[in-house]
Amino acid sequence: MMHLNPLVLVGAVIGVITALLVAAYAAVKDKKTAMGFERNMEDGEIMRRLARYARPYLSKFLIVGVLMLFSIAYDIISPLIVGRIEELVAGEFELRALFLGVSVYAGVLVFSMGSTYLQAVILQRVGQRIISDLREDLFSHIESLAHEQLNEIPVGKLVTRVTNDTNAISMMFTNLLVQLTKNSFVILGILVAMLCLNYELTLMVLCFVPFIVIFTVIFRKFSRRANRKLKNATTDINTYLSENLSGIKVTQIFGREDEKMEDFRKKSQKLARANQEQIFVFSVFRPLVYMLYVSSILCLFYLGGMGHLNNVSFLGQTISSGTIVTFYMYISKFFTPIQNLAEQFNWLQSALASAEKVFSIMDIQPRMQDAPDAIELNEVKGEIEFRDVWFSYVPGEWVLQGVSFHVDARQTVAFVGSTGSGKSTILSLICRNYEFQKGQILIDGIDIRKIRISSLRRHFGQMLQDVFLFSGTIRSNIVLREEGIPDSEIMEVCRYVNADKFINKLDHGLDEEVRERGNNFSAGQRQLLSFARTIIHKPSVMILDEATANIDTETELLIQDSLEKMRTVGTMLIVAHRLSTIQHADNIILLSHGEIIEQGNHQELLHQKGRYYQLYTLQYNKMQLQES
């Protein structure tokens, strides 16, 4: 074996290292990621934002860094110790020296395993805390978004952001960053150790590195595409499940189970193919790297064995059996982190892309925000006034046009009109679920835009047609997790709204289980529970939006009795299609195409014989016909 100029050797090493650094830099800086969308944030910006969540746990990361140094030291030192043991065994057998070498190796191994274990435990705990903080902030931000903003984002997409994407980020804190750092130092440390041990054998090992760089670049391309398909397929199936499981009753009513099953099968197969493609990419890359590893081992055994048997001196360095054993271990420890780096850079890109997806949701500015000088509203009498209010969901398509009216405190006002006339929109604007474009809305003479949103809504109680009950118990749904309300007060409210009549018949009373969305209760029972939930929080203004629609006659009588009692609690605003349910209202406002066309009490509107008279006569005749 001929001797090589050390400068040539150093040049080759620098060239290989440069190739690795360029490949790694390209992997991190690539704007196209495994998530399948154009990146808008720089990696540095994402890391800075994530670092804010990691900063409270900086001391823990410093401890992990120290423990990581011990693990790196083991990877670099252990082959030297084993090589020395081999030389002791192959040469003059000295039991004392051999025992000392084995003891040192065992001690280093145990210490390394202990530090690795502690490192893993600390990282898992800290990583989960960081992700828990991030997930809570994300959920809190989603809660702050306006209704119209939430309507623009599929629920399945939000679920994916809160679950899958945050889990991808957790990998970065619990494993990726530390492993990337460790593997980089291990590669450099082993490279230096091999150079010090034998230049030419090191050069032989480095001859295989350019092939790894090429395989890594190719792997990164196909792996990114596979990950993109997998992420998109996962999001698609989550969105589909969220929508169709919520509407499964409609599917069953119209007998569309087979069609929906076929749609789901296609999406499920798409997800399966994406998983298979990702597995295939990894199953090809790993054997290729392993092939290079085996090839380098064979070259080591051949060249090293030839040098050892022929007692050849390489640049003044004699190859001993200990050197061959040491290089054998170094090659294994050298190729393993290189293989891991390629995959870890790819997963890092996926984690950064997931972080950008999460931050893209958190960067959505709520359209309903408190003014800088917004005030707290401690008490509300319930006086409401609309002054020339204009509102549109879509620019240019006005839903309300110059609406003006006044509601005195403790008055009951009903809004009637055809579908799309703007009745429910008025109630939504009062609670600031949407922002109106023109005019003013006043509560007790104060512009609602000058009141803190949380403070404003605290004085409103909303009872909607589609009552939403949370999984839990009847008690938890009435008090809404507000501790300190005694059962006696809860039952008093239930009696007030006639909900006690069915609660007392239940086996567990207030502790009766409420399934998802309250599906184990009838529509009327859910409505009575919503009345109790509203009354117990003592609102100053009560809003009923089609609260008596689709209710059986017996339950409607109970609800009507409850409404009569609730009129004494505070101001009441009602939207109803059944005109018979609002005859008691102090004022009835009739809307058409976003404008008020009639208003007055029931008798006044009948005497006018206008549109309200026509609607009432039509409904009355229909009821008479049904009774006959």
Where are these regions (language model features)?
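Alpha-helical segments in transporter systems
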Residues: 2-11, 59-80, 84, 101, ...
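Juxtamembrane loop-to-helix connectors within ABC transporter transmembrane domains
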Residues: 54, 119, 123-124, 141-187, ...
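Transmembrane helix-loop-helix hairpins at lipid-water interfaces of multipass membrane proteins
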Residues: 1-40, 61-115, 122, 196-200, ...
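ABC-type nucleotide-binding domain
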Residues: 363, 370-371, 377-628
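Loop segments that connect adjacent transmembrane helices in multi-pass transporters
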Residues: 151-156, 229-277, 373-375
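Cytosolic ends of transmembrane helices, especially the final helix of ABC transmembrane type-1 domains
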Residues: 233, 256, 280, 289, ...
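A hydrophobic transmembrane-helix motif
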Residues: 77-79, 83, 111, 177-220, ...
